[in-house]
Amino acid sequence: MPEHYDSMETRDPAVREREQFARLSEIVARAMTAPGWAKHLSGVNPKAVTSRAALASLPVLRKSDISALQKEHPPFGGLNVTAGNKVRRLLMSPGPIFEPEGAGADWWGTARALYAAGVRPGDIVHNSFAYHLTPGGFILESGAHALGCADRSSLATE
């Protein structure tokens, strides 16, 4: 078994930072296609967000602001860039904050963290997070399945 999840984990730090900041302007530009983000980031030139200083200058969106935006513009406050037909689940975190779960195999990126913690394909992951409106159970399950693991909640009763 490889020691690392993929080659991204063994990149030279300077290369990693260069690649991350090269993508950051694309991420900011995509966020600004949502009306809530466009308003929050008004005056920001996405193409200029290419350094730590530029990142630090972006306005912070606080959890309380998200909750207020979602009350004003349900369900996502104008912050969602995922098309409605691409949303697998509508989840709710404490706040309350409503969150869309997209349709990707490991939407939350949890497989990488599980791998770093020593979880490997074929392992059984005991997932004791809730599966109600909160995302915890779904987040762990998607990462376990992306790694090729069974999570305890998906196993048939013996």
For each of these PLM feature ranges, what is it?
Residues A116-L147, D151:
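Conserved AMP-binding loop of ANL adenylate-forming enzymes
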